[in-house]
Amino acid sequence: MRNGLILGALAAVVITQAGCGTQVKSVALQPSVQQPAAGSGVALYFGSQTHPAVQQQLGEASVSARVARAQDGADASCDKALEQALDKLRAAAQEKKANAVINVQTRFHSAETSSSTNFTCGVSPSAAAVAVHGDLAVLQSN
């Protein structure tokens, strides 16, 4: 009887925890994320995307964001997490007087993307998260 209760309790825990893991996704970048945010003047260049000549390197910046998962789906939640992370990245660039962040990479834990078309995001039933890294730079203006 006692063994049956223990096995039943263990089975209940396993069933409730099934499917609760975080999924690492590759999500398409929206074209709007690369444009300077209103008032920031900081452009973003993902991966090896071409950009104007670098006048000055100002170091690196790494930021992350985690948002509650909304009802509109995993990709939309990842987009919101990326938007928040990029806002933080732009703020770090402004603080150092940079007008761009180049070589932008995204990651979730050890899964990293250096792409100009996709980004990496971790999404669970409750949240979405992304980390962003890039080189702060002053680019020549045209």
Question: Where would I find each of the regions flagged by the language model?
Answer:
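Bacterial N-terminal signal peptides that target proteins for export
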Residues: M1-G8
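C-terminal motif of bacterial Sec signal peptides marking the signal peptidase cleavage site
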Residues: I15-G19
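Bacterial signal peptide processing site
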Residues: G21-Q23
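Post-signal peptide N-terminal segment of mature Sec-exported envelope proteins
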Residues: L29-P52
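A short, structured loop/turn motif at beta-sheet edges
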Residues: Q49-Q55, A92-V101, L139-N142
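Short, well-ordered alpha-helical segments
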Residues: V63-E112
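Charged, often glycine-rich, active-site loop that binds/positions anionic groups
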Residues: E112-S124
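C-terminal edge-of-domain segments
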Residues: S124-N142
